[in-house]
Amino acid sequence: MKKIITLLILTYLPLSAQSPSYYNSVQQLMGNDLKNELHDIIKEHNEFSYTSTKNILKLADQDPENENNVILIYKGLSISKEDFASNNQQDFWNREHVWVKSQGGFNGDETYGALGAYSDAHNLKPCDASINSARGTKDFDIGGSPNSEATGCNFTATTWEPRDEVKGDVARIIFYMDARYKGDSGEPNLTVVESINNSSDPLMGRLSTLLEWNEQDPVDAFERRRNQTIFNWQQNRNPFIDYPEFANLIWGNNTLSSIIFDVVELSNIN
């Protein structure tokens, strides 16, 4: 990936030395204006059945050191791609909806395959089946008791804290889901909020914690490769992986005097 580093003043955001640019239309935007424009950029994507997402994740979350394995999001272990928990077998993997499907009303039919938010691969991660159940419908926040099976993960009755190595990954997935799903054409209207224990409302917290995680755990090569792999299938990207700074410009401290962007070269962009 070619990188072009440009120092930008927030009153003007020239995002590109490339033309055309995937993000060209977000220049000079902040707050809800920026989020709404990102929504327009990423809202049209190829949809796949839920069954198909298993194959997408086998590529997107492939262990860089073992092409036969995937990396589990909360445990951090590398296990065989073929150890899929079709019947919730212990120590096998299944698909974790990082934005909980019940907190968005996008439960789908796993037998026949559901489209849209339910099968959006950006929101799905390989996860140990028992840990997926332990996380359940909990919001994200810090603190609680250690999970005995997933080292580095903590939990309370209402919150889940992932291991440090994927805190930023989780935050950027949640930010993507908020920007992507705004209630268009019967889709869920998802909103990241400061509150927790939001029941079945299409809300996910805790916003302030997720903003901290976005900064504490920067984007790495694994996350960038995953974003590109999913783009190859869905033809939409997670903007918060390409530009983590977007999160603060929308929800956080947008008074910074300057930010740095890596300009992403994309194939198949017209």
Question: Where are each of the predicted segments found?
Answer:
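N-terminal module-boundary/linker segments of secreted carbohydrate-active enzymes
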Residues: A17-I79, F246-I260
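Domain-level detector of nuclease and nuclease-like folds
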Residues: N87-I260
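Hydrophobic alpha-helical membrane context
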Residues: P14-L15, D109
